[in-house]
């Protein structure tokens, strides 16, 4: 029995080595497409796993810095009506201080030598996507940006018209 298992393992390694030789040997790193998974829109730290297990810690730390930046720099309003007048209906959240601010909905995460995450907010005009504080827009229909499943669900929910009353915050 042990010999059979050993033989299967050896066969798998041999097959993997054989396949490793397949492909275009002339492809250089400059020719290779960049992985779209190293930059993308995610909705939570749990989405960091979409960048690969080795990137989870860097991704989560970048998100934590983005949340801190959002909390420190977001304009606050004394009531929800003033907030919604400034940023739009159903696009506000209540801060720990009791004041209202624009709802933090997702993050644009870029991993590399200096991992970073940018806070993202609901897109304008019912578009399925998000926008940054500098008004850069990331739409789900844009093929150059990867959305996690959760981020796509959040974008779709925020873009769909509400049906009676306020939609709950995420």
What are these regions (language model features)?
Residues 2-6, 10-11, 18-170:
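Mitochondrial intermembrane space
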